[in-house]
């Protein structure tokens, strides 16, 4: 296990990241990959959104500035479901360069884009083991995962 000392954690997602300990999980209603919050559980730590959102740049798909209703699109008959052109993610946007002692929480897609562009990802983390409330809404996670 690797431990970073004197680490500052910045959350570069658009929402807070709330961390719970394993004891916060309702073992009667949870299974691996589908963790449910126990009644009365309180978070261990919350990382507020930093204000900067690291993301992956989209390549392909529909041109910028085209309103969804004006796009040329395929349809999935007979349901009349619009189908847009595919996109891929290439490169990152608003992802700072690595800084000693600073860990960055990013989305899975931003982390994968950083890895694909050859960035050193030792400082990048995503959420792991999502925790949901009784209604199924995501309320936090049990850990962070390194971007490999």
Q: Across the structure, where does each feature detected by a protein language model lie?
A:
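Intrinsically disordered, low-complexity segments enriched in small/polar residues
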Residues: 5-148
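N-terminal amphipathic/basic-hydrophobic helices that include classical n-h-c signal peptides
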Residues: 1-3
């Amino acid at each position: 296990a690797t431990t970073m000392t004197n680490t500052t954690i910045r959350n570069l997602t658009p929402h807070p990241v709330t961390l719970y300990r394993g004891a916060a999980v309702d073992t009667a209603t949870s299974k691996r990959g589908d963790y449910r919050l126990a009644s009365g559980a309180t978070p261990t730590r919350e990382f507020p959104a930093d204000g900067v959102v690291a993301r992956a740049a989209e390549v392909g798909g529909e041109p910028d500035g085209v309103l969804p209703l004006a796009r040329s699109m395929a349809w999935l008959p007979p349901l009349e479901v619009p189908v847009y052109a595919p996109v891929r993610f290439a490169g990152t946007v608003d992802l700072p360069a690595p800084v000693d002692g600073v860990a960055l929480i990013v989305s899975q897609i931003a982390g994968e884009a950083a890895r694909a562009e050859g960035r050193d990802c030792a400082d990048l983390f995503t959420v792991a083991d999502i925790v949901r409330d009784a209604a199924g809404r995501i309320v936090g996670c049990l850990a962070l995962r390194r971007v490999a």
